[in-house]
Amino acid sequence: DQQVAFDGAKSLWLYGRTRPEECDPLFQEWQKAGLRTQELIWSRMLLSFEQGQYGLLSYLSRQLTTNKNDAKRLLAVYKDPRRLRHKSKYSGSAKINATIVDMGLRRLAKKDLKQAVKLYAKYQKSDRFSDYKGRQLSRYLVRRALIYQTEELRSFVDTMLPLLDSDDLVEMRLRWALRVKDDQQFQRYLPQLSQAKQNSPRWTYWRARILQNGDKQQQQLALQILASLSEQRNFYGFTAANMVNKPYRIQHQTTVIDPQRQLQLTDDRGLARVTELLAIDKQSDARAEWVMLLNRYDKPMQKQYAVYAVTNGWHSLGVQASIQAKLWNDMQMRF
């Protein structure tokens, strides 16, 4: 079907890197049919810009018959994104100006983050971006500032964070505060996390740690939080247990054997193959057969296969079955 082939050609062609030569015959037929439009060429130019493929970007620019001046400006910004400091050249109302500025600032941020933030603020004041684009770009810049924990950009980060409503960025800011031992900033940003994140073991633990640095009332609250956290079976629960001298809560639950379901196992040819493969020490083949076997059954039946494996001393297969059956509380089987 020619239409299917041409649809596939479009999907293949719209890519930010050079495609293999084997694709050329398909692309040529697609182009002859008049389906490679100027809009598509421009879209691929933007993709190649994002991928850092200047050669492809330059080649595509020569295929344009319209918007040649815009293409020249895009190429110029790619080569030197600091050109964006000449704000008047990118202040027109055309949508492409906002696109060039957006992509140029992202590229500049990889070379000179401080300059990128400075220029972003100037363009933002002149309403260069739509609300959505401005939000996405500010998120990108804030993330880079948080990754590098650039002290000179902390005020920018602290101004933008409340506007972005992003748990992952707030968590990065909290880690920054922990690294520099800034309890005040930690207490400022913890409430900006969603309630679910605030109540997670990680941030419950660190809230208690920060409270330990406070007055006696806060220290007492920290002990209460740690005691409660120590009831959980996770890294922070175990760490809290160490801090309050309480035993770890393993919460073991033995998987119950279902005699009726166990009888069904004896008729399973797949299980017979696993048994024979293990007998001749074909461990990899037995494991592959075991995984296929488990995939044929629901969770209740997978539990019984897990029990069968452990009973027969097939410990690695038992662990695999416990994972698929989600037997997270059967500690003896999992470990």
Spans of features found by a protein language model:
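Cell-wall glycan-active module
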Residues: 1-335
